[in-house]
Regions:
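Residue-level recognition of single "structural anchor" positions
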Residues: 1-193
């Protein structure tokens, strides 16, 4: 049996670097918050999953509130059938676990632990993600997926020795190759799962 912590992290939708003529809404001045209360389409949901071996899944999921269908699309064939899901009390996780026929341990609101099941590891991951993202003073949402991959790479190789990290960096930086024009890159939309 494997235990997986599933959780979401919310970022404000950012058009940083977009010219005023191309903006779909007026810009937020001096870092003001999202205007709508609660989770809205002005926010981006990043889904995260972490198991006991520190295997990490971190991807842009959707704008606004996540659904069980989006979770199925993301985690299909990535989580084993005999896994136990440890999540918060969001309804999408309950429906997802039921649809995928997985054992589900729900941690109640205001709690972090129930018996031997907890969400401390994923909470720790989110605090380090938040610290890491704060260094950049805001990231355009269209590039957020790239930053999540970068964070995953750093998290995956942080425990290795420096010489192994350098070899891994060289290997991973030269494997993927894609041909993209600058014009296409500037005007692209965020890539959700």
């Amino acid at each position: 049996m494997f235990s997986h912590n599933l959780y979401k992290y919310i970022f404000a939708y950012s058009y940083k670097g977009t010219k005023p003529a191309n903006m779909p809404r007026p810009s937020r001045k001096r870092g003001k918050q999202v205007k709508k209360r609660g989770i809205s389409n002005e926010q981006v949901c990043v889904a995260t999953a972490l198991d006991r071996q520190r295997n990490l899944i971190i991807e842009l999921l959707c704008t606004g509130r996540m659904t069980s269908d989006e979770l199925k699309k993301l985690y299909n064939n990535r989580i084993g059938e005999d896994s136990i899901l440890c999540t918060d009390s969001h309804k999408s996780y309950m429906q997802f676990a039921e649809d995928m026929e997985l054992e589900h341990k729900r941690i109640k609101r205001g709690k972090h632990k129930e018996d031997i099941y907890h969400i401390q590891h994923i909470n720790s991951l989110h605090s380090s993600l938040k610290r890491w993202m704060n260094r950049f003073n805001g990231v355009a949402t269209k590039y957020l997926g790239n930053y999540m991959k970068w964070f995953k790479w750093i998290d995956t190789f942080s425990a290795e020795k420096e010489s192994i990290q350098i070899k891994s960096f060289m290997l991973h930086s030269h494997i993927p190759y894609s041909y993209t024009k600058i014009k296409e890159f500037k005007n692209r939309m965020p890539i959700f799962v």
